Structure formats: structure tokens, C-alpha cells
């Protein structure tokens, strides 16, 4: 077993003491997860299925308990040994909880319930709280999926305005370059898979492995041959054109796409003299599309200038919407890309008369790493407990920050059948609104069993159906 695989130690230290802190007579608890606002006013839900399969799919064992007991005693925390041993002996080590969640891929306005966790055994009412640490990590894939989804809406808008084939172009317009800039292999896999909810382009191989293992998708994303600086500069400055010619020799075939970073020395000279003059006829004869990648400078200015220079060399066609589409070549910008700079680039080239077909984008750290739990203000809170047989509301309402006010009661998420709009509601309200709304939450996990799974294809369909 891996040294991090003990579920009992996949929590915050203080959680080990919480079973002693509830009111006498407590025998059930109810928790929920929401985005309390943030950078974006909608979130694309994704990643819970993977977290559940990774973190709680294995029953708790007495060996786990022995390990946790020894470590927590040395660490300075009390430990509910009797409670955990009862779960192993009486329940076979399966966690007595029910988890309900919005279907993965659904895009839900912030300030709404996204998932709930409730106890199913009176003696183990404290288990949902113990799992907060690992379950709230869903903030990460949800936030990455949300950033990626928001970018997709930006790109879709410009494609619809300037392209003859917006839906055909869209899936490969944002490429994941983030594997090397993320905090861990696991984060690369989970965050990379979250991006693949919205796009098909990625260089994060671990994301393909996660999608294959957890979302029933043999190959979730695609890439193309591409140069890096070392494969160009190793030829030497004087042989730069030979490095580019080698890329054509190795990869340029009819219908193929090959990307070549071209700013190792002078991006503008590379386009004018090498790509646009010396190699021009070779590119045309190859039948391939060569994608030039600038990797420095101001992204907005550099992309526009590259398009202008490539247009001088290769010319363009004017599409049905009156925008220019370059012949034989494209540009991909992967340096300095975030939702704001991406929009600025598209605004600039649109104003210059170029279709969004001409450019693609890569995002690395801004996609997988420059996010945190506060990007969308994620929280997992207790909203109800049952004490002496009666449910009571549980909530916080700090006078120093009204934004941290939590919801109260046993909750769910309703979706209006006519408008598709979501709103959080009490479970008791579901029957009242049965005529006009559906309960949007689905039981995905109960008492050690995964009850509902989504394929990545289904997740993508949910996300693609939503709009800003």
C-alpha cells in the first residue's frame, strides 16, 4: 500500500477530535458543498467521481486503524478508535455515508448546492465531517473545468462572429500545456482531465490516464508533433533554417499539422526570411499546415504582427463572413495566455480583419496552477444535525464577513423544467415543486458503493449544453 493510502489519515489533524465535540444525543449529520461566488458566476462541476474512486473506494481495515492510532497519539490528537473499529467490524469497513451531486459537467450558478454528504448510521454520524478535507478537494477540478469552460465561451463567441465553421474549429482552440507547471502528477491528471471536459487538445498525458481509468474514455485528447527551443537551437543560430526544414522533412505530410516554436532568436526574421521565403514553397508543396509558435513578447502585439507577416508571405482567403483565413499556416500562442489576454488577442485580430480560425492558444500555469480554493470561494459546511431525534439547522453567520454565511437545513438543488434555471432548496420542498422542478442532485455514492458514474462523453455533453 502507498504511504498516503490510509483514509483515516487523509484529513486535517483537528478532525480527529471532532467526534467528541457534537451535542449529546447527536446521531446524524448533513453537509453540503458550494461555490460562494468568486471570479466567475458559474461553475462547471467535475472531478468528484475520480476523487471518490481514488480516496474512498477501499474499505477501512484494522491495519489502517492501528497506523492512525499510533500516529495521532504521537501527533497530539485524540482518536476515535472504537468508532472506527465498529465501522470495520459491523459495516465491513465501508463508510456509512450518502453523497449526492449534480451530474458532472453541469454548469451551475454560484451560491448553489453542488453536492451533499450525509451520514447513514447513527453510531457514525461524525464520518461526513471527517471526510471534509478530501472531499473539498473537488474545488480543484471544478475550478479548472470552470476556467476552461469560460475560455470556451470566449472563443466560441469570436468563432461565431468570424468563422465559417465555428463548431468544427472550437474543440482544438485551447491546448493544455500545464503538466510541468502544476504542483504534482496527480494534480496534472485531475486538472488536465478537467480541461478535457471542454476541449480535445492536450499535452498532459496523465489526464488521458485519469480519463481512461475513471471516466471510461480510451483516448480523451490529442496532440501533434511540435518543436521546443532545444530542438531548434541545437542546430545553432546560423542553421536555424535547417532546423525548420528538418521539421518539414520529418512531419509535414498532406493533411498533417506541425507546430514550430520560432522565436529562439528573432520571430519576425524567422517568418520573413525562413518560413515566408526560403521554406515557402516546401510548406505549400507538403500539403501540411504549419503552425508558427511565438513564445515571448507582448502576446497581443506579437500574434497580430505574426499574422500580418504570414499573410504577406502566404496570402489568405476571405471567408463567408468577410474575414481573412491564412493559406497553409496558422499561429499558436502559448506564452502569457489567460482568459483576459486570450480575449484581447481575439479582439485585436478581429479588428484587423482576421478570422479566429487563424489562431490557437496554449495555457499552462494559468489553467492548472494559478487557481486556489478562493478562486471560486469553495466551502463544505454542516447545515443540519439530528439531536435527540429532531433535525436542527446548523449554520454560521459571522458579523465580520457576510460572504461566509452558510446555508441551513437539509438541502438539495432544484432545476426548473421550463427555464433550466437552478436554485438551492430544502429537501422538504422537493415534493412541493414536483410539478415544475426536478431534483438536480443524483445519489452517486452510498455505503461504500458507487451508484452512478458518468462517461467523459456524457460530462462533455452536459458542459456543452450550457452557455453564459
Curated annotation (Swiss-Prot):
Signal peptide: none annotated. It catalyses: beta-nicotinamide D-ribonucleotide + diphosphate = 5-phospho-alpha-D-ribose 1-diphosphate + nicotinamide + H(+). Changing residue 373 to A: Loss of activity. Changing residue 332 to F: Blocks the tunnel, results in a 403-fold decrease in catalytic efficiency with nicotinamide and shows a weaker binding affinity for the inhibitor FK866. SUPFAM superfamilies: Nicotinate/Quinolinate PRTase C-terminal domain-like (SSF51690). Changing residue 291 to F: Blocks the tunnel, results in a 403-fold decrease in catalytic efficiency with nicotinamide and shows a weaker binding affinity for the inhibitor FK866. This is Nicotinamide phosphoribosyltransferase. It comes from Xanthomonas campestris pv. campestris (strain 8004). The lineage of its organism: Bacteria, Pseudomonadati, Pseudomonadota, Gammaproteobacteria, Lysobacterales.
Amino acid at each position: 500500500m502507498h504511504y498516503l493510502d490510509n483514509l483515516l489519515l487523509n484529513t486535517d489533524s483537528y478532525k480527529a477530535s471532532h467526534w467528541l465535540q457534537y451535542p449529546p444525543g447527536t446521531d446524524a449529520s448533513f453537509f453540503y458543498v458550494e461555490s460562494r461566488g468568486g471570479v466567475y458566476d458559474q461553475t462547471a462541476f467535475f472531478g468528484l467521481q475520480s476523487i471518490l474512486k481514488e480516496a474512498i473506494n477501499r474499505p477501512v481495515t484494522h491495519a489502517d486503524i492501528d497506523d492512525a492510532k499510533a500516529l495521532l497519539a504521537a501527533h497530539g490528537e485524540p482518536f476515535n478508535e472504537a468508532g472506527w473499529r465498529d465501522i470495520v467490524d459491523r459495516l465491513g469497513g465501508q463508510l456509512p455515508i450518502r453523497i449526492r451531486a449534480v451530474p458532472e459537467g453541469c454548469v451551475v450558478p454560484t451560491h448553489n448546492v453542488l453536492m451533499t454528504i450525509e451520514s447513514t448510521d447513527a453510531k457514525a454520524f461524525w464520518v461526513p465531517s471527517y471526510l471534509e478535507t478530501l472531499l473539498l478537494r473537488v474545488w480543484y477540478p471544478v475550478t479548472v473545468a470552470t476556467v476552461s469552460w469560460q475560455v470556451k465561451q470566449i472563443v466560441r463567441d469570436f468563432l461565431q462572429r468570424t468563422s465559417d465553421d465555428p463548431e468544427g474549429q472550437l474543440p482544438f482552440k485551447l491546448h493544455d500545456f500545464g503538466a510541468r507547471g502544476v504542483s504534482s502528477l496527480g494534480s496534472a491528471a485531475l486538472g488536465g482531465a478537467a480541461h478535457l471536459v471542454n476541449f480535445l487538445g492536450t499535452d498532459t498525458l496523465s489526464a488521458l490516464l485519469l480519463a481512461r481509468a475513471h471516466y471510461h474514455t480510451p483516448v480523451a485528447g490529442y496532440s501533434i508533433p511540435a518543436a521546443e527551443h532545444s530542438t531548434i537551437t541545437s542546430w545553432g543560430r546560423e542553421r536555424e533554417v535547417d532546423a525548420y526544414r528538418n521539421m518539414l522533412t520529418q512531419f509535414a505530410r498532406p493533411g498533417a499539422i506541425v507546430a514550430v516554436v520560432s522565436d529562439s532568436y528573432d520571430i519576425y526574421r524567422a517568418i520573413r526570411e525562413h518560413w515566408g521565403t526560403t521554406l515557402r514553397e516546401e510548406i505549400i508543396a507538403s500539403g501540411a499546415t504549419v503552425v508558427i509558435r511565438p513564445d515571448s513578447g507582448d502576446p497581443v502585439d506579437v500574434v497580430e504582427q505574426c499574422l500580418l507577416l504570414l499573410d504577406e508571405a502566404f496570402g489568405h482567403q476571405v471567408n463567408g463572413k468577410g474575414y481573412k483565413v491564412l493559406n497553409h499556416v496558422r499561429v499558436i500562442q502559448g506564452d502569457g495566455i489567460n482568459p483576459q489576454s486570450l480575449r484581447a488577442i481575439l479582439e485585436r485580430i478581429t479588428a484587423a480583419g482576421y478570422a479566429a480560425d487563424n489562431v490557437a492558444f496554449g495555457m499552462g500555469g494559468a489553467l492548472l496552477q494559478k487557481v486556489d480554493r478562493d478562486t471560486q470561494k469553495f466551502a463544505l459546511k454542516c447545515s443540519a444535525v439530528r439531536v435527540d431525534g429532531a433535525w436542527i439547522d446548523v449554520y454560521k453567520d459571522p458579523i465580520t464577513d457576510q460572504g461566509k454565511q452558510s446555508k441551513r437545513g437539509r438541502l438539495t438543488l432544484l432545476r426548473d423544467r421550463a427555464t433550466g434555471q437552478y436554485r438551492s432548496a430544502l429537501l422538504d420542498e422537493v415534493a412541493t415543486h414536483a410539478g415544475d422542478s426536478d431534483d438536480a442532485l443524483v445519489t452517486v455514492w452510498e455505503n461504500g458503493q458507487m451508484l452512478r458514474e458518468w462517461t467523459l462523453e456524457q460530462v462533455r455533453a452536459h458542459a456543452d449544453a450550457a452557455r453564459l
